[in-house]
UniProtKB/Swiss-Prot annotation:
<feature type="topological domain" description="Extracellular">
    <location>
        <begin position="216"/>
        <end position="229"/>
    </location>
</feature>
<comment type="similarity">
    <text>Belongs to the TM2 family.</text>
</comment>
<feature type="transmembrane region" description="Helical">
    <location>
        <begin position="195"/>
        <end position="215"/>
    </location>
</feature>
<keyword id="KW-1133">Transmembrane helix</keyword>
<keyword id="KW-0325">Glycoprotein</keyword>
<keyword id="KW-0472">Membrane</keyword>
<dbReference type="Pfam" id="PF05154">
    <property type="entry name" value="TM2"/>
</dbReference>
<feature type="signal peptide">
    <location>
        <begin position="1"/>
        <end position="32"/>
    </location>
</feature>
<feature type="transmembrane region" description="Helical">
    <location>
        <begin position="160"/>
        <end position="180"/>
    </location>
</feature>
<feature type="glycosylation site" description="N-linked (GlcNAc...) asparagine">
    <location>
        <position position="58"/>
    </location>
</feature>
<feature type="domain" description="TM2">
    <location>
        <begin position="162"/>
        <end position="210"/>
    </location>
</feature>
<dbReference type="InterPro" id="IPR050932">
    <property type="entry name" value="TM2D1-3-like"/>
</dbReference>
<feature type="glycosylation site" description="N-linked (GlcNAc...) asparagine">
    <location>
        <position position="34"/>
    </location>
</feature>
<keyword id="KW-0732">Signal</keyword>
<dbReference type="InterPro" id="IPR007829">
    <property type="entry name" value="TM2"/>
</dbReference>
<feature type="glycosylation site" description="N-linked (GlcNAc...) asparagine">
    <location>
        <position position="72"/>
    </location>
</feature>
<feature type="topological domain" description="Cytoplasmic">
    <location>
        <begin position="181"/>
        <end position="194"/>
    </location>
</feature>
Amino acid sequence: MPQISVNYILLCGQFLLFFTVLLLQCLEGIHSQNSTEPPGNRVTTSKPVLFSEQPEENVTESGSVIPTETSNHTEQYEYNPPSPVVLCRYLPEEFIFCQDPVDHGGNVSAFQELGYGCVKFGGQVYKDVNHTQVLCTALDGIECAGPREFLRGNEPCIKYTGHYFITTLLYSFFLGCFGVDRFCLGHTGTAVGKLLTLGGLGIWWFVDLILLITGGLTPSDSSNWCTFY
């Protein structure tokens, strides 16, 4: 019985692998060619547009086309109590779009001039959080009476920028001597001092742990802690 050399088996395996790679490259090229086929060569199965569905157009003597005005559902309706059309400010939340609270950055004069917005953000308890109205707009295609832009709601002046209490507490406990917790919260100046003193020889590290637990150390941008759901 003839013996098959190991080198012969390896050589056959290499040829088989090379042939497989070439086959895959050919299949990939065919697939990419089909995917980049121009739209004019493809068979379209879309529904033909009926003549009655095409918008009416006016043609001038010079050949230019002037489109006619179409019906618009965003026009303002006059409020009539017996009619089913409600005021825009009474629409449910799924039919309106509300902007984020306006940030005045501590400018009280701008708040008094505009009449709404947030002078400051943040707060750990309800009584410490400012509330404001926000500018809302009725969505396109929704019929309602009165102005389509209006002030609504009593939104809290809070924002979230990706800071988690548990994560920051772990940073403070394990890496607090290097100021990692304050770096994460945006307190760069004090973080550098904490790093150079190795957490104030342990005293600063312990104080920051207490401040985090009691709510005395918060993000520098006045944002609130993100919650896990």
